[in-house]
Amino acid sequence: MTDSTRSLRNCLAPAKLNLFLHITGRRPNGYHDLQSVFQLLNWGDTLHFTLRDDGRVARVTDVPGVPEESDLVVRAANLLKAHTGTAHGVDVEIDKILPMGAGLGGGSSDAATTLLALNRLWQLDLPRAELQSLAVKLGADVPFFIFGKNAFAEGIGEELAEVELPTRWFLVVTPRVHVPTAEIFSDELLTRDTKPVTIADFLAQQTSDAEWPDSFGRNDMQEVVTRKYAEVAQVVKWLYDVTPARMTGSGASVFAAFHSKHEAEAAKAKLPASWNGAVAESLNEHPLFAFAS
């Protein structure tokens, strides 16, 4: 990342994985209570920010399928601008590589990187807690990326506690299918009564003899998604022939963990050509963590 008084270049918006995802209840307003562990990855979209003196927020690159006015990046910048009353504006360039509808948190991470970067570029110096309270207005996953550490998440995903995770390499496989999150959450057969667990329960997996991620929990959405989307089911089966695997979020991406980059790359080399595969190392901290206190 490069930093100057008028621009911030090469700001990573890291992907996330849900190492497990349990749905423990449903609220009267339709939102679901969940428990999960969010894992940051050293892989994601890259954003570039250039200061404008006319107060305008503009996305200067096209993102297919995402109109500028509904882009979470633009919404995040305008939300921060309205909250603080700053006279500054910004041009935002987005190098988009994360697939949408994949369960990797791409749009949410882009929004969080925007809030963090503009907190620095616009010299706002808002504390992390204040940015998180803004972030929840943009989506349930956005506060996690502002939190900036791997986390045990509860509530609708906004109750976060830091959790230390070992370094791993991941192969993330995404079929050519978009899975709408709302469709999965509304499915009548979705499990909504998984027994709550604790951080201690999760950390105890480190001493388990079972091969990770089979050693703890499951993704409650995976059964519904694989029933509705044959392509996701095929990815899960293919990866399971190599090593234990699990879907992240509401899909469509599926991941497996490896001890080395070499092992992950070797598995990726065998992927069918119609699937998108990426090898990424785990992160312990968001690259822009220092942009809020």
Swiss-Prot record:
Which keywords fit this entry according to its UniProt record? ATP-binding, Isoprene biosynthesis, Kinase, Nucleotide-binding, Transferase
Q: Report the EC code(s) recorded for this entry.
A: 2.7.1.148
Look at the named UniProt entry and state the broad enzyme category this protein falls under. transferase
Where does the chain bind ATP? P99, M100, G101, A102, G103, L104, G105, G106, G107, S108, S109
Name the Gene Ontology molecular function terms of this record. 4-(cytidine 5'-diphospho)-2-C-methyl-D-erythritol kinase activity; ATP binding
The domain of life is Bacteria
Catalysed reaction, written as an equation: 4-CDP-2-C-methyl-D-erythritol + ATP = 4-CDP-2-C-methyl-D-erythritol 2-phosphate + ADP + H(+)
Q: What positions constitute the catalytic site? A: K16, D141
> Where does this protein act, in terms of pathway?
Isoprenoid biosynthesis; isopentenyl diphosphate biosynthesis via DXP pathway; isopentenyl diphosphate from 1-deoxy-D-xylulose 5-phosphate: step 3/6
Query: GO biological process: what's one of them?
Result: isopentenyl diphosphate biosynthetic process, methylerythritol 4-phosphate pathway
Q: Which InterPro entries match?
A: GHMP_kinase_C_dom, GHMP_kinase_C_sf, GHMP_kinase_N_dom, IspE, Ribosomal_Su5_D2-typ_SF, Ribsml_uS5_D2-typ_fold_subgr
The entry's function note states: Catalyzes the phosphorylation of the position 2 hydroxy group of 4-diphosphocytidyl-2C-methyl-D-erythritol.
Q: Which family is annotated?
A: Belongs to the GHMP kinase family. IspE subfamily.
Q: Which PANTHER family match?
A: 4-DIPHOSPHOCYTIDYL-2-C-METHYL-D-ERYTHRITOL KINASE, CHLOROPLASTIC
Please identify the protein, giving its name as recorded: 4-diphosphocytidyl-2-C-methyl-D-erythritol kinase
Q: Where does this protein come from, organism-wise?
A: Burkholderia orbicola (strain MC0-3)
Organism ancestry: Bacteria, Pseudomonadati, Pseudomonadota, Betaproteobacteria, Burkholderiales
